[in-house]
Structures are given as structure tokens and as C-alpha cells.
């Protein structure tokens, strides 16, 4: 048995997710924590004496919805507690959270081997889901004597999702996080963007001997992990660190660590705190809030199909593969955009032949998920949202691509221009300009001849019938003609020039 095989890795997750509310949890300040520092702050958020919490009902509703989509049992009433600690980002000296009675308990998220990338089907136990306020954050440290604080994030509504220590590989933990992220996005509970800090994850890692798996050793907490990828990497490194200690005769100790990207290692932060260190007390300024069965049922009615059901529906379309279907559901507003796009494409292609209609429909996954979403993410000045280009405009582009009015290269070029400057570059305008553009045949011949003369090796490959070479020539001519040359005409010229020359020898 190898040194690694002698040990069983156990991982539990604590996932913090900001709710998509307009206002903060206990004040009337806007929940806009990514604006200019301290521009969205109320007196309560910075704990001025005499200020009292005002509960945001929208936050309670979204938290209840989150608990339901995680299959939790809902508490009959909502009670809050104070978690006491002293830190600069929490001016009150305590955080309002839930300890005695979490909003949701005994939930689960189902991981499917065929859909979620795990080795085998499993139910991830959700121990609890609680509603709490977020803290402020440190935005810059100039020196040891000066710390700048931003309280925009303070009191933004947050849910904490706590799993059982049920993962035995970092990969499965990462698969769960992707699934949870998709579930919460589709429920419109949160955008769950880890890159913005709207979803954050702490990881608890321990190892046990394979010969005595019930004997748990020390648990180490990993904090401040900014992405799912880093969760997987850091968990793997921490497990290996603990195993190395054990193999060398030492033992891990309970502590809090973080992941250092430059060192590619976990590093010590502080000794691990226990519940008694936080001196939990009931929050006396917020009375108990009853959650009636009628209220919970009303929230439940707003929940749509599950992620697995939506994936199965997309995969039944035949032209969706699993990767594209998952990417669509993981994209913020991706599903709703797709649903509108399908209807708009039907309108655009209604007068076209059934073959063209089917071709247009098959274009959707690649052009929506790979091209459009990719262009939005890689816009030169700033990342774009899906509403940059209305579904009707994208449908018009795909319809003209399907019926042969546009080449694939021209369509890509038009889409990129429209994403970069949607006000200046209307898709309708660009498509019509391209359709009406005539590319001079003599110029086209010159482009073809120039490529042929400069690429003798590819010409020889074309002569012996190597696959893909003809497409290379066509693609290069399309780029040089800004997509205006017709692929069939390019193909004809190349064949006439190269193959006729070959047959004459």
C-alpha cells in the first residue's frame, strides 16, 4: 500500500453566498458593495450607538428559497444570535448570525456521476443553512499603523451553507461547489460570483488512517479561497501536508490556514477557534419571526425545475452536449436568454426551409455558449452582461448564418464588433452591410494566388488530398477579405488553380 493510500481524506465545506437583494439585511442602505468605498453605508452598518436593526423581508424570502432548493427542512421561526469577536471589519464587536436555530437544516444536494463529474452518485448532506450579515473588508494596507476599511459590504445579506464532512476527494468538493453555484443562480438567489467575492468558501480538511477510518484526527480550516479551482488545489495540498506529517511521525494540529498562490502551499494564519470563543448570545433587538407553512409554500411555488431536470431537457435537444448545457446553466441569466433566443429564432426562420430552420437551431449551443458568452467575458474594456445583445439580434445573426447569407467568419466578426460597441455596431446594420458587399473577383484571385505562392508545403499537401488543408486556405482568405468573400467561390478558385495545375503535369 502506498503512503497516500494508507490515508482517507475527509473534507467539509462552509460556503458563504451573498443574496441578490436591493437593500442590506438590517438597514435601508443599498446592497451595492462593489461601488466606491463607503458609498453604500448606513449608520447601523457602522454600528453608531442607538441604531437598531430593521429586518429586510426580501432577504428572508431569498434565504428561505435557498434552503428549499437545497432540500432543507425549514425552521418554524427565524431567530438571530450575536457572534462576538473583535476585528476591524466588524465595528459592533459581534456579527448577527444564527446559531441556536438555523433557517434550514437536514438538507441535501444530489451529485450525479453522469452530469456532475463525480466518480459515483452521492448525496451531499447540508447540515444547516443560516442567514447572517456580511462584514466590512480591508481594501488596502499601507503600513502596520494604517488600515483602510470599506463598509459597503457590512450588513449585506449572506447565507452560510454548511455541509457534512462527506467529501473524500478535492475533486468531488469542487464538483459540489459548481453544482451549488448553478442551483443558486437558477433560483435567482444570488449571482454567486466568486471572482467578485459574492460566493466564498472555507474548507475543513482532515485525514484518517485507512485501517481505522472512524478515528478522526485534527481538522484544519482553509480560509479565503477565491475560486473553485483554488478550493480543489488548496485542499489537495493541505491533505498531502497532513499526510506527510503523519508519515514522518508528527500529527496535524487544529488551526486556520490559507492558500499562498506564489508558494503553491497552505500557510498558517492563526490557531483555530471553537464555538465557545465567540460567546454566542441571542440577538435581543430582533424578535422571533414566524415562518408559517403558507409562507414557505408560497416561496416553494416560485422554484422552477431542478438543475438535473434542466440538463436532461437540454440534452434531449440532441444538438446540446453536456459541456455546453452545463456552461449555459452556469452562466448568469443564460437559461432565460436561451429560452427567449429560441422563440426569436423561430420568428426569423419561419419563412425559411425546414432544413435551414433545423440548421439554425443546431447553431445555438456553439454561438451562444462559446462565441457570445466568450465575447462578453473577453470584451476589451470591461466584461459584458448577456443583455448586451438582445436575443432577437442574435437570432437575426444565426438565421442569416444558417441560410448562407453570412459565412461563419463574417458572423464571428460581426458578433465581436457588436459586443465591443453595441450602440455603434448594430447587428442588423452589420449583417445587411455584409450581405450587400460585393468582393471584387480579381482581388479575390490575387488573395488566393498570393497564399498559394507563399505556402508551397500546404499546396503540396492539398494536391495529395490531405484533409483540412483546403479549409486552412479558405479560412485565411476569409480573414483577409474581412468575411466578405464567399467560401464556395474561394474553394472553386483554389481547386481551379491547384488541382488543374496538378492535372496538367
Curated annotation (Swiss-Prot):
Stored InterPro entries: Asn/Gln-tRNA_amidoTrfase_suB/E, Asn/Gln-tRNA_Trfase_suB/E_cat, Asn/Gln_amidotransferase, GatB, GatB_Yqey_C_2, Gln-tRNA_amidoTrfase_suB_CS, Gln_synth/guanido_kin_cat_dom
Alphabetized, the UniProt keywords read:
ATP-binding, Ligase, Mitochondrion, Nucleotide-binding, Protein biosynthesis
> Which SMART domains does this UniProt record tie to the protein?
GatB_Yqey
Pfam families to which the protein is assigned, alphabetical: GatB_N, GatB_Yqey
Q: Which GO terms describe its cellular component?
A: glutamyl-tRNA(Gln) amidotransferase complex; mitochondrion
- From its record, what is one biological process in GO terms? glutaminyl-tRNAGln biosynthesis via transamidation
The top EC class, named as a word, is: ligase
Comment field (misc): This protein may be expected to contain an N-terminal transit peptide but none has been predicted.
Which protein are we looking at? Answer: Glutamyl-tRNA(Gln) amidotransferase subunit B, mitochondrial
This protein's species is Schizosaccharomyces japonicus (strain yFS275 / FY16936)
